[in-house]
Amino acid sequence: MSLNGTFSHNNGLPSGEREESETPGGSTSIISSSFLLQPRASDSRPDALEGKYDKNVLARALKKSRDSCLNGALFEKFLPEENYKLSGGTVFSHVRYIDTATLCVGPLRFEDTKFYFVHYSNSPIEPFAKPNISYVNPQWNELDYRPDSQKLSPGKEKNTLDLKHCLLPSPEYKAPPAKKPEDYEASPGEPVEPLITDASLQRLKSRANEDPTIFNILKRISKGLGTPEQCMLLHNELIGPSTFPLPKRAKKPPRKRITLSINQQDKDEFFDSLINNKKEVRRHFDIVMEFSDAPDTKWIFPRESVLSHVFNTDKKKLEALSLLFHVYRPTEDRNVIDVKTEIKIRDFTPTLRSAIELLTSGTHADRLLSEKRRRMSNLEPKYYMQFHEQT
């Protein structure tokens, strides 16, 4: 259940998941703790709920919700040793600190959350640190790393030969010779008759006075806003019919449609992997988080999130990064619950923003996998709060 203020009757709640408290009006408030696992960023603020419901019940609900986030209700735990064993001892994790930001989960705020960038490789050695770009090594890039020649030469002597060998040769650009009027003439020395004459200009002027469409087209072309078709129309009016081929407009590629055939065997394997907590080998790169309330554990940022930017129109700046993702949980009746969850990142730096945008820009195969998991699961069950009047 979410804290969005919509409440109705539900008799399917297990008794072990309810908390009861006596309200001053003599009614009993029953609240299920299952919905507290997945609060959403679109939920109401706590102060909007205080007028309707008991403050103690709301405080306990928010406390339980915060503890569930810290204990792994939303995110997967980052275990580099386990990932190393799953890969057969071939994938190593290299962790680097990015920056801190505020993670918002519904009405909950996790300030000073640390974010790390994890790079997986087959080498146990940390990759090269980025050197300073200077006149000594201006051609450096991450794909073709060439170390400083001074480090390779013995002692403190500067070896100019090694220095020239390290640097890439500077490209030599030769400017093409300027064309002379004779180059455009069929036979040099003879006067060239201009294609645009005074008569054609007068004819175009009279046409523009008669037809306002041509006048508006000329205005757009003079401002540099003319389309290729309008420029060809001007060519036809001044010179005559154009011999150039018509411009071809680029068409958008067809949208990739997700076609999936899911049978019961796929659903059983998906359920067994969740119930047995089977892990997949994580490769390439990840972003992990570390809450200030629980600094001993790191959590993996959801890679299959759908990223959207929240702008503040008054201040004209980017206010938050909103991420929508799915959390899958097994049930006792051999089923999988799909809980759609939304989080927001605030007070972030440009470095963290670029890292999150890089992580969430998944390929079509990633979107296909997430769509398959969503179709193999059921929607989130709704648990609601209800007030019972004593008879």
UniProtKB/Swiss-Prot annotation:
The keyword Calcium does not apply. Residues 1-13 have a biased composition (Polar residues). Keywords: Chromatin regulator, Cytoplasm, Nucleus. One of its GO terms (biological process) is chromatin remodeling. It is found in: Nucleus; Cytoplasm. Component of the SWR1 complex which mediates the ATP-dependent exchange of histone H2A for the H2A variant H2A.Z leading to transcriptional regulation of selected genes by chromatin remodeling. This is SWR1 complex subunit swc3. It comes from Schizosaccharomyces pombe (strain 972 / ATCC 24843) (Fission yeast).
